[in-house]
UniProtKB/Swiss-Prot annotation:
It is a single-pass type IV membrane protein. Its main location: Golgi. Residues 10-22 have a biased composition (Low complexity). Pfam families: SNARE. This is Syntaxin-5. Residues 1-53, 58-77, 310-335 are annotated as: Disordered. Residues 29-45 have a biased composition (Gly residues). Residues 467 are vesicular. GO terms for cellular component: cis-Golgi network; endomembrane system; Golgi apparatus; Golgi membrane; SNARE complex. InterPro entries: SNARE, Syntaxin, Syntaxin/epimorphin_CS, T_SNARE_dom. Residues 375-437 form the t-SNARE coiled-coil homology domain. Residues 68-77 have a biased composition (Polar residues). One of its GO terms (molecular function) is SNARE binding. The lineage of its organism: Eukaryota, Metazoa, Ecdysozoa, Arthropoda, Hexapoda.
């Protein structure tokens, strides 16, 4: 029993010394060798290397636990197979080995999954390891492979364009279609009326635009026709403008006739008086504008004819005078009678015409050339005047058509006049009635004051005496 107690005490001392020895080795070894027992793991590589060392068993464990062991000492190896202290030592070694193995496996799993936490060493500095460490072949392969860059998106820039007018026209057309469809669903007769009215307004608007453009051309022709200078005369441009304006007037006359036909159709299919009167008034206004424009055009053509006549008289005056050679010929006697300083120059410049028989020939040739030019000019002016006369005749035909249209609308105009006269009479009668009522009210004012005074008197009487 005593020997067993001694052995138990020595075993406890050996166990405490071995545990402190292993802790000191862990502190000296650092992160490279790893820790055994209760020390923290220095790194996953050290743990893996340490896990490969088999744990001491049996006799080796007893030798490793002894602290006072030296190389020369002889230690008796007792049998711990049945001793409870030997079993405790083996269990402790097995527990330490299993703890190291579990920590090693957890570190390896963290390395594989990429969730390895930072490892605390003796200097208490945190280290973070990558989730996966590439090999050398993978590293060089990643360098050799070119990196695929995503293509930059192409930016398409569209030119700006103002299409507000087109948008407004599209909306108007859609609105007109919707109105027509709605009216078609409800009443086909009203749909026809709306369609005819829209057609009438479209034609009237087109005629108004054409009249405005023709007025602009007429103003330009007026500016050109009123010029009286011979050098700033542009007959070709005037003729072109005259021809264009004449065609525009004919086209406008035809368009107004079409508009009048549309208004007649409206009268047949429409019972409303206001719509009929509106359409007839618009036709009459457009006809009056066309008539005034035709009158202005006729006056401009008359002004142009007057200017042409004046230019012709001026040209005739200058062409009937002495010829240019006759006016500028200098006889040798007059040259000699001139200045003595210019005598040499006159002698050098003067040309001897030879005999006097050649001078009449030259004068007749120049006169014939002048006459030919004047004849061409007169022919051009005659053609211009003929064109003007034909245009005036066509304008007379347009006036006749306008007069016929006005004659057709005479009844409507008379109705408008009678309605205006009736309205004026009614307004005058209403004014007279209002004056009569005002006079009657002004006469009865004193009566109203008397009645009001009597009421106040009775009120005061009852209030004073009844109270």
């Amino acid at each position: 029993m005593q020997t067993r107690r001694r052995l138990h005490q020595t075993d406890q001392q050996d166990y405490s010394s071995s545990s402190t020895y292993t802790i000191q080795e862990d502190q000296q070894g650092g992160a490279g060798a790893g820790s055994v027992g209760t020390g923290t793991a220095g790194g996953s590589v050290g743990l893996l290397a340490q896990s490969l060392v088999p744990p001491p068993t049996g006799h080796e464990a007893a030798i490793h636990i002894g602290d006072n062991y030296q190389s020369g000492d002889s230690i008796s190896t007792p049998d711990y197979s049945d001793d409870k202290y030997g079993k405790a030592a083996r269990q402790w070694n097995l527990r330490a080995f299993s703890g190291h193995a579990l920590r090693t496996l957890s570190a390896a799993a963290a390395v594989v999954t990429g969730n390895q936490p930072g490892i605390n060493n003796d200097s208490q500095s945190n280290y973070s390891y990558p989730a996966s460490i590439p090999t050398s072949s993978q590293f060089y392969q990643s360098k050799e492979e070119p990196q695929e860059t995503e293509p930059e998106p192409e930016i398409f820039v569209m030119a700006a364009r103002d299409r507000t007018g087109e948008f407004a026209n599209a909306i108007r057309s859609l609105q007109a279609r919707n109105i027509t469809r709605a009216v078609n669903i409800r009443d086909p007769r009203k749909a026809k009326q709306v369609q005819s009215y829209s057609e009438f307004m479209m034609v009237a608007r087109f005629i108004g635009k054409n009249i405005a453009s023709t007025y602009a051309k007429l103003e330009k022709l007026t500016m050109l026709a009123k010029k009286k200078s011979l050098f700033d005369d542009r007959p070709q441009e005037i003729q072109e403008l005259t021809y264009i304006i004449k065609g525009d007037l004919n086209a406008l006359n035809q368009q107004i006739a079409r508009l009048q036909d549309i208004s007649k159709d409206q009268r047949r299919h429409t019972n409303g008086k206001h719509l009929v009167s509106h359409s007839s008034n618009m036709v009459l206004a457009l006809q009056s504008k066309l008539a005034s424009m035709s009158t202005d055009f006729k006056q401009i053509l008359e002004v142009r004819t007057e200017n042409l006549k004046q230019q012709k008289t001026r040209r005739d005056q200058f062409s009937q005078g002495p010829g240019p050679l006759a006016a500028h010929t200098v006889s040798p006697s007059t040259a000699k009678q001139g200045s003595l300083l210019l005598s040499e120059e006159n002698q050098a410049v003067s040309i001897d015409m030879g005999s006097s028989d050649t001078t009449p020939l030259l004068s007749t040739q120049t006169q014939m050339a002048i006459y030919d030019d004047s004849d061409n000019y007169v022919q051009q002016r005659a053609e211009t005047m003929q064109n003007i006369e034909s245009t005036i005749v066509e304008l007379g035909g347009i006036f006749q058509q306008l007069a016929h249209m006005v004659k057709e609308q005479e009844e409507i105009v008379e109705r408008i006049d009678t309605n205006v006269a009736d309205a004026e009479l009614n307004i005058e009668a209403a004014h007279g009635e209002i004056l009569k009522y005002f006079q009657s009210v002004s006469k009865n004012r004193w009566l109203m004051i008397k009645i009001f005074g009597v009421l106040i008197f009775f009120f005061l009487f009852f209030v004073v005496f009844m109270s």
